[in-house]
């Protein structure tokens, strides 16, 4: 290829990246960068975080199944935006740190940060030429996906030349407020930082849920994936957090750690789980045969104030895990 053709090709490639937030990662930039950025940028009222190392996941033989569930579930509307402009998120995204300020991970409203190599000036030029919506806030340009008028629409911005942030407008502004020092960051939460330290570097996928979100996620696992007549409110109140991690090797293994206030409350949850496992509601799980088998073979033990849960299965059973966890 001649030098002129090569230069024209590079210009075209960069233009495509500009439309798609220029998520043209030059390689893995360190597993801690997205995590550090998320903890120092997310607002303090964030109740849930989820981390995925897509560069590591892509090396798994299970990746064809993983990408259908993990990537699409976590990026949702944002990945639709990327695909609509010809960017392949499963190839070009290496790390993402997501956050939620609500109580359910299945609901809308996730925001996040992604590390990469960006060309902000080229993106601004493209949006100016195409007259796509751009807002200004705290000295940053917020680029809109779509008309920019939808309150649930996705916006993105460049925090620096190697870090992008995205989410709904109010969440993205909250991230900028944190970075400008006018609001507290998530890393001021010492308990959550302690939980994060347990998970960092041990798995390509992990997450933390706190507050009511923790109980909302723990309840379906404890109840066998189906609503039952037992009032679980008293059992769920002592739950401080739910930590989870997922590993892949010819299938998946998920480990869930339910952190309780006291060893006594963890013992109560353990007893409840054993009772429900032998009840018809557990074996008749509403998630289908896959989830019923998965939950029936769930391994559990108490470790002080923690209830530790382990389950494993083939890659195509991941849907059931996600449904049970929602």
Q: How would you name each of these model-derived features?
A:
Residues 239, 245, 252, 289-302:
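C-terminal regions of proteins
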């Amino acid at each position: 290829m001649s030098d002129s053709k090569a230069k024209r090709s590079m210009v075209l490639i960069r233009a495509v990246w500009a439309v798609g937030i220029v998520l043209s990662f030059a390689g893995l930039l360190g597993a801690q960068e997205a995590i550090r950025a998320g903890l120092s940028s997310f607002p303090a009222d964030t109740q849930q975080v989820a981390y995925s190392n897509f560069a590591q996941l892509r090396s798994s033989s299970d990746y064809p199944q993983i990408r259908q569930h993990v990537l699409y579930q976590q990026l949702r509307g944002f990945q639709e935006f990327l695909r609509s402009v010809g960017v392949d998120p499963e190839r070009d995204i290496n790390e993402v740190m997501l956050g939620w300020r609500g109580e359910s991970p299945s609901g809308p409203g996730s925001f996040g940060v992604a590390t990469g190599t960006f060309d902000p000036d080229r993106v601004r030029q493209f949006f100016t030429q195409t007259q796509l919506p751009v807002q200004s806030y705290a000295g940053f340009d917020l680029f809109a996906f779509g008309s920019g008028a939808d309150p649930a629409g996705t916006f993105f911005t460049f925090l620096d030349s190697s870090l992008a942030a995205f989410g709904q407008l109010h969440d993205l502004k909250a991230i900028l407020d944190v970075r400008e020092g006018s609001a507290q960051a998530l890393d001021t939460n010492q308990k959550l930082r302690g939980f994060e330290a347990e998970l960092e570097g041990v798995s390509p996928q992990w997450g933390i849920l706190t507050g009511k979100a923790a109980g909302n996620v723990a309840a379906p696992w404890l109840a066998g994936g189906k609503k039952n007549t037992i009032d679980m409110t008293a059992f769920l109140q002592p739950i401080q957090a739910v930590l989870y991690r997922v590993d892949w090797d010819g299938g998946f293994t998920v480990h869930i750690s339910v952190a309780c206030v006291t060893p006594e409350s963890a013992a109560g949850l353990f007893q409840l789980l054993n009772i429900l496992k032998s009840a018809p509601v557990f074996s008749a799980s509403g998630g289908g045969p896959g989830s019923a088998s998965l939950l029936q073979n769930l391994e559990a033990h108490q470790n002080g104030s923690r209830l530790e849960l382990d389950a494993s299965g083939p890659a195509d059973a991941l849907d059931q895990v996600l449904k049970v966890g929602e």
